[in-house]
Amino acid sequence: MMAAGTALGLALWLLLPPVGVGGAGPPPIQDGEFTFLLPAGRKQCFYQSAPANASLETEYQVIGGAGLDVDFSLESPQGVLLVSESRKADGVHTVEPTEAGDYKLCFDNSFSTISEKLVFFELIFDSLQDEEEVEGWAEAVEPEEILEVKMEDIKESIETMRIRLERSIQVLTLLRAFEARDRNLQEGNLERVNFWSAVNVAVLLLVAVLQVCTLKRFFQDKRPVPM
């Protein structure tokens, strides 16, 4: 994944470990998640390569910053605008089937002149290449061999387990992003409460001092004492 322009502020790139490929051809596209800091008044774009005839799911959340909103757009490799959202806190979008090439994801914070945003997004691929590999593995074994359990049943069980495990990872990742956003909100509220509490205490002390000074003036006798 490549960022358009210079990577700004906090950037955390988490990828699954690469899978080794014995034969020729490009390695499979990996799912990934990315957290970055989007400055006020700026737009940040990313490019992600995708194979043909696959499924690409994009999920994003604004987990920090005033308003917790951002503009989002997604373009195909041909430059066709697939998704355009304005001032959203989160979103989930699926492209199926995908085109071979680089998809463009943009996050825009131009509407904000002061507040920067902490944005998390995740890319999830579901390629047909995995199914073809499983089919090739099944064809390498003769169906009339000693095993009584059908290879189709084994393949379906493994595939179901793989899908459930991948979905569990995705759900846990989203829950982690929600937790980070809620924590940022609570910390921001705590800072505001502490600030205004300190202001109120300072005002009360100032009023108390002024009242004491005013009362002292009332009881002061400034008339001259006769000799």
Swiss-Prot record:
It is found in: Cell membrane; Endoplasmic reticulum membrane; Golgi apparatus, cis-Golgi network membrane; Endoplasmic reticulum-Golgi intermediate compartment membrane. Residues 216-227 are cytoplasmic. It holds the Pfam family EMP24_GP25L. A motif (COPII vesicle coat-binding) lies at residues 218-219. Residues 43-125 form the GOLD domain. InterPro entries: Emp24-like, GOLD_dom, GOLD_dom_sf. One of its GO terms (biological process) is Golgi organization. A motif (COPI vesicle coat-binding) lies at residues 218-227. Residues 145-170 form a coiled coil. The keyword Transmembrane applies. Residues 24-194 are extracellular. It is a single-pass type I membrane protein. The chain crosses the membrane at residues 195-215. One of its GO terms (cellular component) is endoplasmic reticulum-Golgi intermediate compartment membrane. SMART domains: EMP24_GP25L. It comes from the Eukaryota. Residues 1-23 form the signal peptide. Keywords: Cell membrane, Coiled coil, Endoplasmic reticulum, Golgi apparatus, Membrane, Protein transport, Signal, Transmembrane, Transmembrane helix, Transport. The keyword Lyase does not apply. Potential role in vesicular protein trafficking, mainly in the early secretory pathway. May act as a cargo receptor at the lumenal side for incorporation of secretory cargo molecules into transport vesicles and may be involved in vesicle coat formation at the cytoplasmic side. Plays a positive role in IL-33-mediated IL-8 and IL-6 production by interacting with interleukin-33 receptor IL1RL1. Plays also a role in the modulation of innate immune signaling through the cGAS-STING pathway by interacting with RNF26. Belongs to the EMP24/GP25L family. Homodimer in endoplasmic reticulum, endoplasmic reticulum-Golgi intermediate compartment and cis-Golgi network. Interacts with IL1RL1. Interacts with RNF26; this interaction is important to modulate innate immune signaling through the cGAS-STING pathway. This is Transmembrane emp24 domain-containing protein 1. It comes from Bos taurus.
